[in-house]
């Protein structure tokens, strides 16, 4: 990890802070995230399998990507519904579901123009219809929203990329390309720079398991918003993987551009690895010499794919997928810090996100994506994570002192004013019980206040799952509790 990954972290002027009083709907137990040295993290919201509140109706096989708008306020998830007769497309509905990156609540649905899949008629008058549109989504450095068409065989079926206007759903095609002599499925893509009006490139890797076509990464370069002819350097052949037991990109491969010379690839049988544009490894977890240290930092298993890196306050970080649904942390990611050169060998664990994983999720599309929005002025990085079929979760990360000011209800864990807080929340049948007198507010999972009581050690409630805010002696505790 050599340089800041400009394609994965947006630099913002301001990040909006949630001013809602009381516990946040879907917020994790804050005690899971103690401060790490002078840094802390604040879970904004979570709607995912392990929390039991995964409520996104569109998450499924055809909602495989996620992106964040350039201003950091919106989470975008594409969705398609293809209607086929005798395995031939007859119609398609392409949508971008827009959620608040601050609260996770759905805000609107953008119906994308049918021009994205209906390309008119050919010379014989037959309709030209494309399936598999909107298989992935990205936002480039200029804030352009891009949708990707999956090619199941790029030798005969074009990979396509479309710029989408979120106001009216209109589209502009910036790529429709086949590659003669190459067979391969290209599910997802990455973007660097401004590919609509400026300079940059698109990058996509085969999701093939064979050794002949399954090691290919393709690049499409843009100058002044104009697609350039591909040359030999744009057809990249991967020469090695980590772990070395991997023999191809295989399924659901994700690529993440760093700059003109470097990109990350996270593949089905290999871990997130930094590559040169000639397909050789620039850096990997193999550079961590001590085996125990390496095992503590590298993924528990391959399979789920996603990686990003960013800098905040002069410190470099990376966040990457570490597990599948059957690992100790089920479907999780890891946030680490790095040295100035961003070398794998310098990685130090900061947090696992979510701390207990997103859950036991069947995810054949292999999507577990981190997206990061950085606001240097505020001293905050907002990390949003999306798991195909499994949900999403968001965090604010930064100096603990900054987080405490932005989120007054944040619970510092450990020593506070040279005292250790002893307030805890438990339950008995029909009651929420406090270990000492405190003011208590109880909310249901929809954020509705159920009961509020001052200076008490218990409140009576009906059986169910509740979010509890309790406060005494200046300490604030937010947690979840199940009452029988």
Please give the residue ranges for each predicted region.
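Short coil/turn segments that connect the beta-strands within blades of beta-propeller domains
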Residues: 71-73, 142-144, 198-200, 259-261, ...
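Beta-propeller blade signature
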Residues: 91-104, 157-169, 214-225, 331-338, ...
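Loop/turn-rich, solvent-exposed surfaces of beta-rich toroidal or solenoidal domains
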Residues: 270, 290-351
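Surface-exposed loop and turn segments in beta-propeller and other repeat-based domains
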Residues: 23-58, 107-130, 170-192, 226-249, ...
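Signature of short aromatic-glycine-proline-rich micro-motifs recurring in repeat-based ectodomains
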Residues: 48-68, 120-138, 147-151, 179-208, ...
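C-terminal outer-membrane/trafficking sorting elements
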Residues: 414-484
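Short glycine/acidic-enriched loop and turn motifs that connect beta-strands
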Residues: 80-90, 151-157, 207-213, 269-271, ...
């Amino acid at each position: 990890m050599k340089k800041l990954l400009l394609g994965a972290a947006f630099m913002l002027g301001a990040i909006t802070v949630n001013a809602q009083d009381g516990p946040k709907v879907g917020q994790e137990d804050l005690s899971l995230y103690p401060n790490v040295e002078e840094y802390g993290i604040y879970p904004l919201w979570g709607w995912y399998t392990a929390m039991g509140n995964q409520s996104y109706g569109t998450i499924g096989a055809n909602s495989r990507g996620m992106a964040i708008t350039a201003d950091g306020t919106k989470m975008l998830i594409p969705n398609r519904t293809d209607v086929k007769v005798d395995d031939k497309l007859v119609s398609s509905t392409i949508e971008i579901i827009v959620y608040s990156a601050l609260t996770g609540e759905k805000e609107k649905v953008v119906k994308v123009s049918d021009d994205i899949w209906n390309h008119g008629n050919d010379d014989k008058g037959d309709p030209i219809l494309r399936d598999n549109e909107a298989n992935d989504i990205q936002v480039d450095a200029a804030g352009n929203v891009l949708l990707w068409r999956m090619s199941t065989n790029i030798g005969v079926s074009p990979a396509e990329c479309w710029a989408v206007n979120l106001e009216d759903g209109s589209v502009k095609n910036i790529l429709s390309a086949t590659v003669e002599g190459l067979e391969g499925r290209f599910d997802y893509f990455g973007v660097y720079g401004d590919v609509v009006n400026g300079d940059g490139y698109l990058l996509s890797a085969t999701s093939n398991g064979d050794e002949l076509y399954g090691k290919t990464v393709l690049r499409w370069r843009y100058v002044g918003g104009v697609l350039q002819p591909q040359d030999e350097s744009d057809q990249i052949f991967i020469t090695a993987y980590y772990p070395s037991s991997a023999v191809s990109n295989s399924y659901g491969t994700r690529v993440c551009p760093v700059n003109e010379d470097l990109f990350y690839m996270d593949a089905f049988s290999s871990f997130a690895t930094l590559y040169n544009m000639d397909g050789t490894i620039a850096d990997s977890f193999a550079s961590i010499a001590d085996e125990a240290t390496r095992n503590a930092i590298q993924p528990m298993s391959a399979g789920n794919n996603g990686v990003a890196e960013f800098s905040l306050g002069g410190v470099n970080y990376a966040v990457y997928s570490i597990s599948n649904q059957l690992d100790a942390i089920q479907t999780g990611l890891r946030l680490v810090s790095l040295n100035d050169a961003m070398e794998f060998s310098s990685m130090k664990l900061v947090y696992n996100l979510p701390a207990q994983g997103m859950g036991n999720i069947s995810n054949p599309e292999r999507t577990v994506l981190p997206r990061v929005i950085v606001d240097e002025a505020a001293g905050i990085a907002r990390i949003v994570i999306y798991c195909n079929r499994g949900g999403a979760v968001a965090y604010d990360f930064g100096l603990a002192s900054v987080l405490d000011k932005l989120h007054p209800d944040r619970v510092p864990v450990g020593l506070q004013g040279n005292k250790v807080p002893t307030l805890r929340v438990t339950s008995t049948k029909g009651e929420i019980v406090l270990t000492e007198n405190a003011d208590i507010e109880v909310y249901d999972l929809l954020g509705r206040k159920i009961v509020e009581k001052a200076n008490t050690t218990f409140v009576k409630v009906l059986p169910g799952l509740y979010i509890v805010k309790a406060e005494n002696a200046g300490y604030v505790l937010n947690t979840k509790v199940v009452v029988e």
